[in-house]
Amino acid sequence: MTAKWEKLEGNEGVLTVDVESAKVDEALDKAFKKVVKKVNVPGFRKGKVPRKIFERQFGVEALYQDALDILLPEAYAAAIDETGIEPVDRPEIDIEQMEQGNNLIFKATVTVKPEVQLGDYKGLEFEEKDTTVSDEDVEQELKSLQERQAELVVVEEEAIQEGDTAVLDFEGFVDGEAFEGGKAENYSLEIGSGQFIPGFEDQLVGLKAGEEKDVEVTFPEEYHAEELAGKPATFKVKIHDVKRKELPELDDEFAKDVDEEVESLDELKKKLREKLEKDRAHEADHEKRDTLIQKASENATIDIPEAMINTELDRMTQEFEQRLQMQGMNLEMYFQFSGQTQEQLREQMKEDAEKRVRVNLTLEAIANQENLEASDEDVEKELEKMAEMYQRSVDEIKSIFATQGGTDGIKADLKIQKAVDFLVEHSKAVS
């Protein structure tokens, strides 16, 4: 077999493939063995028709499509290996010659991975972020812990304040008619949380348990239920209970309740400071890397094929659906709730998809330019991390990857990570 690659404009080209006649005849034999099981010829049992009789009645051409189905995938894959091109979409195949006793000749119009013209990627600047943790930061974190440990206590004869939780019944009406989903009993609503329509919670401030009120609001214009969007509504509300947060004392006992590993409030404060310092250092490092990656990709010149963007959109849509499933939803439910279509969702994601593709192509080009590769030892360490994370043995993790085509994906990801590390090592901090 021979293969010739001819580059056209943009990211397209034509792959001309010539497959020897022996391979064609071999594929025709396989095709006959498959097809003969399905044909009926008078005087012969199904599957027992001689080849010559079959060709006399149906013609050898009846085998061509099945033979092509056998030949093309293998020949196309071999041609890609021979020419070293990197297709990013399905090819358009044009059969130029296909007949018994002769070579198969076909042309494949292929969209390939684009060439990347790197711009500046060494010496890129990033803003040094202050990661200092102050005493006030620690106190704020301590206050948040105190808030989370607070108990809701019913307050008798006291009016609702901001931050209180009201236990209430409500029923909503638009144009004097009750609407679906507008009614609840014994609903707990934290005042100021913004759970309800703007203006609803504010009008409950000052009410006491046992009191009733008509709350007048207007649904937002962008409200998800179109039949209610922009319309004024009246909610009949009855307050059952008013609950207020009762904060625990900030003392050693509180510290031990929050964290079993500490014995005093001072120890807890020290631990909180260390965690804040670690978190801020991690956040600063993430921002630095993100800044450098974005600058390097913006400096590169790339003509990105639409096919690569569409593939990334498919991946992003799948990731989005997985997040929805974690919340007990699926795409169909999301579209119904949001009023969006799949086309609108993809259009909304398209800019981010293009950025992702641009970033990956840029980092891959930097890795190639700087001869950065992931070693077998790097892959082994990554597998060990995965084994620890999922509490499995390394051999089990390897077996899983073996069923999925091996660890080439890990090696490619590590190569990209080395490119990011390279950007960091060759960057400049500015204040």
Swiss-Prot record:
EC numbers for this chain: 5.2.1.8
Top EC class, one word: isomerase
InterPro entries the UniProt entry points to: PPIase_dom_sf, PPIase_FKBP_dom, Trig_fac, Trigger_fac_C, Trigger_fac_C_sf, Trigger_fac_ribosome-bd_bac, Trigger_fac_ribosome-bd_sf, Trigger_fact/SurA_dom_sf
Cited Pfam families: FKBP_C, Trigger_C, Trigger_N
Biological process terms in GO annotation: 'de novo' cotranslational protein folding; cell division; chaperone-mediated protein folding; protein transport; protein unfolding
Keyword Chaperone in annotation: yes
Cellular component, GO annotation: cytoplasm
GO molecular function annotations of the record: peptidyl-prolyl cis-trans isomerase activity; protein folding chaperone; ribosome binding
Cellular compartment(s): Cytoplasm
Domain of life: Bacteria
Keyword Isomerase recorded: yes
Catalytic activity: [protein]-peptidylproline (omega=180) = [protein]-peptidylproline (omega=0)
UniProt keywords, alphabetically: Cell cycle, Cell division, Chaperone, Cytoplasm, Isomerase, Rotamase
Domain PPIase FKBP-type: 163-248
Job of this protein: Involved in protein export. Acts as a chaperone by maintaining the newly synthesized protein in an open conformation. Functions as a peptidyl-prolyl cis-trans isomerase.
Notes on the domains: Consists of 3 domains; the N-terminus binds the ribosome, the middle domain has PPIase activity, while the C-terminus has intrinsic chaperone activity on its own.
Assigned protein family: Belongs to the FKBP-type PPIase family. Tig subfamily.
UniProt-listed HAMAP family: Trigger_factor_Tig
Name of the featured protein: Trigger factor
Organism: Halalkalibacterium halodurans (strain ATCC BAA-125 / DSM 18197 / FERM 7344 / JCM 9153 / C-125) (Bacillus halodurans)
Taxonomic lineage from the root: Bacteria, Bacillati, Bacillota, Bacilli, Bacillales
Gene name as annotated: tig
